[in-house]
């Protein structure tokens, strides 16, 4: 078996010298969001598949071709998040974040999997 020495197609490594630039951009974006009244939300990397079927649409390319879905030990269908909005809305509803009135101003910095 050949030693794997290259990142998978479509991915990149963010190495020293580049990571500092990314950190600076993230810090500026975070500061701007918070100065404008947004709060950070962090949601799980995976969600119940039905959440994405209902929010993205069960006949879209995302659902039909671009989601990484598997069954957990309990037989439930779980999907790595292909986007962030559905999980953020689910968390907002589940945790009653809308009780303080509207608008609910949230931001997230996440990895998505397609």
Q: What function would you assign to each model-found segment?
A:
Residues 1-114:
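TRNA-recognition modules of translation machinery and tRNA-sensing kinases, especially anticodon-binding
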């Amino acid at each position: 078996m050949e030693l794997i020495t290259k990142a998978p197609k479509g991915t990149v490594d963010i190495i020293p010298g580049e990571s500092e630039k990314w950190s600076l951009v993230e810090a500026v974006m975070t500061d701007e969001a918070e100065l404008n009244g947004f709060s950070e939300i962090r949601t799980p990397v995976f969600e119940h598949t039905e959440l994405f079927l209902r929010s993205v649409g069960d006949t879209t390319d995302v659902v039909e071709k671009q989601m990484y879905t598997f069954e957990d030990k309990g037989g439930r269908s779980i999907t790595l998040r292909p986007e962030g909005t559905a999980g953020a809305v689910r968390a907002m509803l589940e945790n009653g974040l809308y009780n303080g009135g509207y608008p609910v101003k949230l931001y997230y910095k996440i990895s998505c999997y397609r």
